[in-house]
């Protein structure tokens, strides 16, 4: 009696290598369901191998630093430089050496439906996480570039008191005035897993804040646009004016401040 297709599918789920003899054995099974399951599992393994290769490539900066003797490498990234409203948020994340988290990438490349899952995976595996938040008022005072630096420095400061302290910083396209060895990496969130981890932490943290602001200030679509200048947001500005979380140094908010009595 031939093995049921259900049993074959269960056996295939345990296979992790394309060279597994089970593939060759099942290749002669003429049943359509078996061949479909066979191809599906082969495709899944190929995808896993490609993901493993991608993650390994994104550890190149970290691996080079481990060889130099560094032990606790922190990735640093920010989210929220461009929006018209809300804070800029930075995160500093130290992952265990050679840690790989499936699906972890530049947060802009991760489907929104997977943000929370990967965020939780980072939180579970990280040795240390720090978050820095600079509000719109300070952004207006010092400019967004300086505010981004302040958010990053605050994120690093948040690690004080935690068991693991960074001995090297990998920073997304920024250099910080701090006495810790560091490297600025252009598009770091797409090239370093540590920075990618910081990217998703900062992204989810800020999105949660903007969703809360959406409840406080309805009509601007903050939960969907995160404060960026979408059509809905601009219509909200026209209809309701500026809110306490809008950046008065950013256009068109700046012009609205000059031409109205809005606070």
From Swiss-Prot:
GO annotation (BP), single: mismatch repair
Q: Where in the cell is it found?
A: Cytoplasm
Which keywords, in A-to-Z order, does the entry hold? Cytoplasm, Endonuclease, Hydrolase, Manganese, Metal-binding, Nuclease
Major enzyme class: hydrolase
Q: Which PROSITE patterns match?
A: RNASE_H_2
Q: Where does a divalent metal cation bind?
A: 77-78, 172
This entry carries the following GO cellular component terms, namely: cytoplasm; ribonuclease H2 complex
Q: Name one Pfam family in it.
A: RNase_HII
* RNase H type-2 domain boundaries: 71-262
Nuclease is among the record's keywords: yes
- Cofactor binding notes: Manganese or magnesium. Binds 1 divalent metal ion per monomer in the absence of substrate. May bind a second metal ion after substrate binding.
Q: Cofactor(s) for this protein? A: Mn(2+); Mg(2+)
Reaction it catalyzes: Endonucleolytic cleavage to 5'-phosphomonoester
> Which CDD domains does this UniProt record tie to the protein?
RNase_HII_bacteria_HII_like (cd07182)
Give the EC number.
Answer: 3.1.26.4
The molecular function GO annotations come to: manganese ion binding; RNA binding; RNA-DNA hybrid ribonuclease activity
Protein family (similarity comment) = Belongs to the RNase HII family.
Function according to Swiss-Prot or TrEMBL? Endonuclease that specifically degrades the RNA of RNA-DNA hybrids.
Name by which UniProt lists this protein? Ribonuclease HII
The record lists the organism as Streptococcus pyogenes serotype M2 (strain MGAS10270)
């Amino acid at each position: 009696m031939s093995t049921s297709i259900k049993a074959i599918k269960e056996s295939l789920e345990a296979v992790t290598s394309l060279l597994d003899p089970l593939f060759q054995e099942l290749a002669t099974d003429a049943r359509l369901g078996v061949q479909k399951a066979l191809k599906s599992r082969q495709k899944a393994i190929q995808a896993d191998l490609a993901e493993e290769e991608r993650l390994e490539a994104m550890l190149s900066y970290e691996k080079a630093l481990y060889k130099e003797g560094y032990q606790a490498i922190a990735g640093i990234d920010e989210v929220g430089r461009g929006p018209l409203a809300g804070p800029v948020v930075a995160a500093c994340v130290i992952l265990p050496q050679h840690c790989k988290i499936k699906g972890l990438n530049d947060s802009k490349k991760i489907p929104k439906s997977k943000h929370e899952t990967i965020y939780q995976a980072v939180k579970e595996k990280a040795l240390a996480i720090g978050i820095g938040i600079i509000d719109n008022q300070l952004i207006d005072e010092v400019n967004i570039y300086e505010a981004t630096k302040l958010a990053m420095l605050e994120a690093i400061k948040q690690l004080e008191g935690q068991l693991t302290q960074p001995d090297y910083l990998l920073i997304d396209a920024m250099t910080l005035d701090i006495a810790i060895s560091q490297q600025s990496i252009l598009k770091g969130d797409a090239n370093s897993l540590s920075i990618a981890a910081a990217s998703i932490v900062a992204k989810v943290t800020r999105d949660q804040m903007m969703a809360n602001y959406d409840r406080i200030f309805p009509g601007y679509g903050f939960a969907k646009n995160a404060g960026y200048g979408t059509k809905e947001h601009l219509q909200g500005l026209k209809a309701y004016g500026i809110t306490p979380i809008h950046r008065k140094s950013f256009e068109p908010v700046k012009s609205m401040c000059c031409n109205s009595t809005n606070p």
